[in-house]
Amino acid sequence: MINKMKDIQTLGQLEKSGYVSKSIKDELRDNLRAKIKSGKPVFEGVHGFENTVIPELERAILSRHNINLLGLRGQAKTRLARKMIELLDEYIPIVAGSEINDDPFNPISRFAIDLIAEKGEATPIQWIHRSERFAEKLATPDVTVADLIGDVDPIKAANLKLSYADDRVIHFGMIPRANRCIFVINELPDLQARIQVALFNILQEGDIQIRGFKVRMPLDMQFVFTANPEDYTNRGSIVTPLKDRIGSQILTHYPETLAIARTITHQEAKLNSVQTEAVYVPSIAKDLLEQISFEARESEFIDAKSGVSARMSITAFENLISTAERRALLNGSDHTSVRLSDFMGIIPAITGKVELVYEGEQEGAAVVAQHLIGDAIRTFFPAYFPKIEKLERDADASPYAKILEWFFAETGFELLDDATDDTYQKQLDAIQPLEDLIQKYQPEFPVKDKYFLKELILWGLVEYNKLSKDRIAVGYQFKDLYSSYINKL
């Protein structure tokens, strides 16, 4: 069918074929209706919005609304807008040579109207794919009306020997050139107020005015805007009359569960087959990584209004894999597993993606990142082992008493960053109470994940102030808390 349509090369052939042109909003609506009826996923690859954002977006499309996606950074706003391309017809005809994708049955540009008047049914047409019907502009303070809508082109006027009174001297901007397309303006509040005002009539009436030319152009467009909440973007805001002309404003959000967050990270992380084959990641490590982002969104050191992007988990996961991969390369090994101490390798991925409040600035970004990792461990620990109370009446009755006794008897225990897997495992196996604790409380835990769990016990005891942990040049040293205190006196 598509090949047959593409064989149609003139207006006359198009008329005889029975082709019926539709507005872009009707295209989106009709194709969405068909997808919903067939039970096919509409916004495939976007996770966590199935019961919240996506139903609202579908309602907006069915209502033929222009849309504003409002949410913090890293909430898949632009991804959703790009996914709307899949709801367009695969190919549509335009008048060949038209700058603004003129519909052969409803031409709006001077060029297309004159060409059809001259050639009639012989007017050439061409077919454009839906992938070409998406235009995107990042709103920046330097964007001008000429960029978006158009301006008089003096070079064109000189070449064609036309006066400035002739509308053929107009050079169309991005919006007219995106006629019959989805047009996305990202970070709308960053657009200067006077530029936002220029969008009023385009959204409502279809009128555009360029340097005194009142050009009546009923542009056929689907506008999608993305914006951060105004209280975060101190750079600007959306002017009220423009808000009034946007049909639906849809609020996005971060993943609500670890499972959804894991799915997003796994989908978006850029790993090659060498990395995935060389590095094994325990399931608990994946959950712990996602928990760090959840902790960051609640942290007193981080500005909640700015949000913590899903990109933080994605880049942190890539760094985590690379930390383990580097160790394997140094040791001449073809395979290794992620360790809890490898999580220190994700600190660079965290520090650049969180906006600190005053208290966080005082602590420093790297220290805050370490706090977040510690908070995630503290949150996870009680899910696997008995909760550690601040005050325990009988220390001997504690499930962790044997572990603490082991450390009290030892001068120190070191886990080196680049130790081989054999060395790492032998070191942890030397602490027999760790094995006993796992056998008692997690007897069915996967064997290949057991060493990560052993290390989690040590880090958990540190977070609950039962052991001390110090960074040494090439790794971490764990000690009995009281002996560490006495040594510092």
Each predicted region: which residue ranges?
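Conserved C-terminal "switch" segment of AAA+ ATPases
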Residues: N3, S17-N31, N159, T233-S237, ...
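Pre-Walker A (pre-P-loop) alpha-helix and adjacent loop at the N terminus of AAA/AAA+ ATPase modules
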Residues: D26-R73, D153, D167, L289
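Canonical AAA+ ATPase core
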Residues: L88-Q126, S131-H171, N179-T276, S322-N331
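Hydrophobic positions on the alpha1 helix immediately C-terminal to the Walker A/P-loop
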Residues: L80, M84
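Charged, amphipathic alpha-helical linker segments immediately N-terminal to NTP-binding catalytic cores
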Residues: I2-F43, D142-V145
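AAA+ ATPase "lid" subdomain C-terminal helix
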Residues: S63-I67, F294-I302, I314-H335, A349, ...
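C-terminal engagement/docking regions of AAA+ P-loop ATPases
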Residues: K305, E325-L489
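Conserved lysine of the Walker
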Residues: K77
